Amino acid sequence: MPAKLPDDTTLRLPRILCLHGGGTNARIFRAQCRVLSTLLSPHFRLCFAEAPFPSQPGPDVVSVYRHFGDFKSWIPMPPNPSISPTNVAKKILNSLRHTIEEDDRSGADGEWVAVLGFSQGARLAASLLFQEQNGGSGMVGVYGGVNFRFAVLLAGRGPMIPLDMDAMASVSSAVLSLPTIHVHGLQDPGLEHHRELLERYCNRETASLIEWEGNHRVPIKMKDARVVVEEILKIAQKTGCLVPPTIQGGGTSNCGALLLDR
């Protein structure tokens, strides 16, 4: 079941769709993103989607989250030839639609302005933004409030996941030109694959890169998370989806403003 931030002060805020890595789930990703979520909460509502396919837990998951199953993947692992790419795409999009509809039912009504993913979820995030760029069907365009303007790609690799075969067949370029934020851990064993996503599949003029001294995980130290959030707020401002700090607990939260002014 998708996991959402329960704070009702976020109901009116623009929303970011968050996609976990393979071999984890929405609950785990919410925990992994706890520092990013706190820093972004004055400006965005983060909603965590659950992948459709059962999976074994990822190698770095068991040590901390082994009791947090069931574990899921965005694509069948290992690959299952009995499930066509079209059916894989349908299952993915159905999971995302369920997340969107459930959050709408909770009373949230902010526009869906960005997508954030880690590892396999980052690959899907890039694919969703590419679909948005090329006018594909699926979830983009079906819901009036879905208008992804940028993506945050934490340790992501290519190639794109084909979510709309007809749209993919008609595009003239496989390069993602909508804004992307790439977050690379310099100690990550998959670093070269993450750099390939940036260099081969994304337009360097609209892509920004953050490198940090970490391995294959979401930044959780405040000093590392702040750098990521600063870039998110910068791109959000450029794309017109940054909301001024909200009133919480009788006072004004200036977390985002402070980050931008630093």
Curated annotation (Swiss-Prot):
Record SUPFAM superfamilies: alpha/beta-Hydrolases
Cellular compartments per GO CC: cytoplasm; nucleus
Signal peptide start and end residues: none
Active-site residues, as the UniProt record annotates them: S119, D188, H216
Inducing or repressing factors: Expression is under the control of the azaphilone cluster-specific transcription factor azaR.
Keyword line: Hydrolase
Pfam families the UniProt entry points to: FSH1
Single Gene Ontology BP annotation: secondary metabolite biosynthetic process
MF GO annotations: hydrolase activity
Pathway note: Secondary metabolite biosynthesis
Enzyme Commission (EC) number: 3.1.2.-
PANTHER family the record matches: ESTERASE DBAE-RELATED, ESTERASE OVCA2
Family as reported in the entry's similarity comment: Belongs to the LovG family.
Function: Probable esterase; part of the gene cluster that mediates the biosynthesis of azaphilones, a class of fungal metabolites characterized by a highly oxygenated pyrano-quinone bicyclic core and exhibiting a broad range of bioactivities. In the first step, the non-reducing polyketide synthase azaA forms the hexaketide precursor from successive condensations of five malonyl-CoA units, presumably with a simple acetyl-CoA starter unit.
Protein name: Probable esterase azaC
Organism ancestry: Eukaryota, Fungi, Dikarya, Ascomycota, Pezizomycotina
Gene: azaC
